[in-house]
Structure formats: structure tokens, C-alpha cells
Amino acid sequence: MTVDLDQYAKPGKDYYLALGLEGSANKLGVGVIKHNLGQLSLDNRAEILSNVRDTYVTPPGEGFLPRDTARHHRNWAVRIIKKALIEAKVKGSDLDCICFTQGPGMGAPLQSVVIAARTLSQLWDLPLVGVNHCVGHIEMGREITGADNPVVLYVSGGNTQVIAYSRQRYRIFGETLDIAIGNCLDRFARTLRIPNEPAPGYNIEQMAKKGKHLVPLPYTVKGMDLSMSGILAHVDSLAKDLFAENKNKKLIDDETGEQITSEDLCFSLQETLFSMLVEITERAMAHVQSNQVLIVGGVGSNERLQQMMELMVNDRKNGSIFATDERFCIDNGIMIAHAGLLGYRMGQTNELWNTVCTQRFRTDEVFVKWRDD
């Protein structure tokens, strides 16, 4: 069944324009997207007019606090919005709607973005569209890669989920029971006191490429779910012993007798976590009888994760893997603009009173009205 995406089209206009605002964590993103009339397809793709982002970066060994992150977003919002509009070569009066991240995420940064969205809505007399952050990642990934109906591995600083579409919902088949994978990697980066720029997870990835020895770490998969807090606690204790030069037989490689390094710990942590993700993703693929995997979220840009997932997919008949680069994996405004515009085209808008952001907003709470396949 084909969904009519143009039942709310404005007379005499053959395209839609939306501005998206993202700020659920330490990245403030603004994007402008264009949809032509008709179904989106390989012959009628969404057009990215601008995708601007600024990141709040803290010193090595420190995380980002909600109040400081919110202050960054407030300080940069006007400049980033202006830059996005200039790059897109559009004015506020050209837009059809203002889309914003309604959740999930950090409360104070989300509020800063919502206030900016409300201000623009009233300034330009445009409707507001609240967007689920997770659905934004999924829809942007589908649009960029052309993936049809994949199993989605959503891995970021605040979320770890295995998702598949069914009956106008993105259903969660497996997820973390405690911390997200991005949070796990970021916290270990703080333990090692490595730089947060360009991103702690990226710096962990680069160190892991130099690792040679695989240190045994807890492997915690429980059915379709996984747990990472125990793994983090274990590898943290090893790192602290390494820095303190404490004698610990686990810091000596059994085969070579060589000293375990920080690079080895990064390598071991990545290999263990990614193996767990591959396992539950493959199980979801078997359950829904899909041969496609789409990786989204900030951790999705990790080359080793993509490589391990590709090895698994290649063992399946006609398997294929889809992923995007850091422009779209890492939090951005264009994904919010795209998902929001899909909702707007189906008549889904938010009244001002219904724009309250929420830190907890499940992926499967969203009614995916623009799909009926």
C-alpha cells in the first residue's frame, strides 16, 4: 500500500522545505532539507541544502555536564541557524515547518533547542514538528543509503538498540540493559585521559588500531539484550592498575609475556563490545528474515564495527550492510529536518503546548504514519 505524502501540499508549490534543530547531547546541529512532491525514491531523493554542526568539547578526562552543554547551545544557536539558512540559500519565509528534537536526550540541552524552535515558529508563523531522535537517525540512514527494510543497529552515546520495522512502528528487538555503547567508550576515554576532540570514541578507535593483544573481558549477552557496565568496570580497573604500575597478571600477555598497553585495552574493549552487537543483530535478522543491516548513530561510523558486521552479513545469503559517514552518523540537524518533514507531509504537527521535550522517548512510541509497507 502506498502512502499519500502530498495530501497536505500547498497549492502551486511543487516542493517542501524544512529546517531541523538537533541538540540532545553535546552537538548542536541545524539542517535544511528539500522534498519534491511525490514518493521519495531513488529517482526522487531528498535534497540536503545545508547541514551545519558545532560540538561542545571538554578537556581530556572530563565529560559534558547538561547545564554547560545547554549554555553552549544557547550561545551558538543563532549563529548556526543563520549559517544553515545562508548555505541553503533560503529565507525563513520559504520554509514549510520547523522540526526539532523532542527526545530522548539530556534535559537542559533539549530545552535550549526547543526554545529556539518555538521562537522561530512564532517569528516566521510556521508549524512545529517534534521528532524522536532515534527515528531521525533511522530515516536519514534509509534515505542516504537506499536501504529498503533493514534491521537497524542504533549505536550512540545514549542509545544501543536493535530495531526492525513492523506495522508502522520501529520495534525494539534488543537493547542495552544499562549504559549505551557510546557512553561506555567515552567513559573509558576519560579513564585514559585521552582528548575529547574530535570525539573520545574516535580516539579510542585510533588507539585500538595499534593494539596487538586481546585481553579477556566479560561478555554479557542476555537473550537479545546486552550489558556493558560490568565490562567498563573491569577494563577501568585494568587501566588504573596499568597507570599505577601495579602487578596484575592480567596485564601480561599469556603467549608472549609482553606488557599489556593502553592500546591493547582499547582494542580488547572494542572487539568485545562489537562482538556482542554482531551477535544480537544477527539473531534479529534471523527472526525477521532480513538480509539487510543498517548501522546508525555516532558509534556507527566506527570502521571496525562496520568491518565486523560486514563479515557476519557476508556469511548470509544475499546479505548487505549499509552505513553512513560521520556527516550523518553523528548527531545532526538534517536528520531531524528529514524525519520531521516526513511527519509534516502526513499532517503530523505539534501545537505550542505540546512541544515539551522529554528525556525518555522510546523509539517504538512513534507512529510511523509515512510508512505502510
Swiss-Prot record:
Cell compartment(s), UniProt: Cytoplasm; Nucleus
Xref: CDD domains: ASKHA_NBD_OSGEP_like_euk
Alphabetically ordered keywords of this record: Activator, Acyltransferase, Cytoplasm, Metal-binding, Nucleus, Transcription, Transcription regulation, Transferase, tRNA processing
GO cellular component, one term: chromatin
Alphabetical GO biological process terms: positive regulation of transcription by RNA polymerase II; telomere maintenance via recombination; tRNA threonylcarbamoyladenosine modification
Record-linked InterPro entries: ATPase_NBD (IPR043129), Gcp-like_dom (IPR000905), KAE1/TsaD (IPR017861), Kae1_archaea_euk (IPR034680), Peptidase_M22_CS (IPR017860)
GO-annotated molecular function: chromatin DNA binding; metal ion binding; N(6)-L-threonylcarbamoyladenine synthase activity; nucleotidase activity
Enzyme class name: transferase
EC identifiers of the protein: 2.3.1.234
Catalytic activity: L-threonylcarbamoyladenylate + adenosine(37) in tRNA = N(6)-L-threonylcarbamoyladenosine(37) in tRNA + AMP + H(+)
Positions that bind a divalent metal cation: 133, 137, 154, 331
Reported cofactor(s): a divalent metal cation
Xref: PROSITE patterns: GLYCOPROTEASE (PS01016)
Residues that bind substrate: 154-158, 186, 201, 205, 302
Record's cofactor remark: Binds 1 divalent metal cation per subunit.
Main localization (coarse): cytoplasm
Subunit structure, as described in the record: Component of the EKC/KEOPS complex composed of at least BUD32, CGI121, GON7, KAE1 and PCC1; the whole complex dimerizes.
Function: Component of the EKC/KEOPS complex that is required for the formation of a threonylcarbamoyl group on adenosine at position 37 (t(6)A37) in tRNAs that read codons beginning with adenine. The complex is probably involved in the transfer of the threonylcarbamoyl moiety of threonylcarbamoyl-AMP (TC-AMP) to the N6 group of A37. KAE1 likely plays a direct catalytic role in this reaction, but requires other protein(s) of the complex to fulfill this activity. The EKC/KEOPS complex also promotes both telomere uncapping and telomere elongation.
Family of the protein in this entry: Belongs to the KAE1 / TsaD family.
Protein name: tRNA N6-adenosine threonylcarbamoyltransferase
UniProt source species: Debaryomyces hansenii (strain ATCC 36239 / CBS 767 / BCRC 21394 / JCM 1990 / NBRC 0083 / IGC 2968) (Yeast)
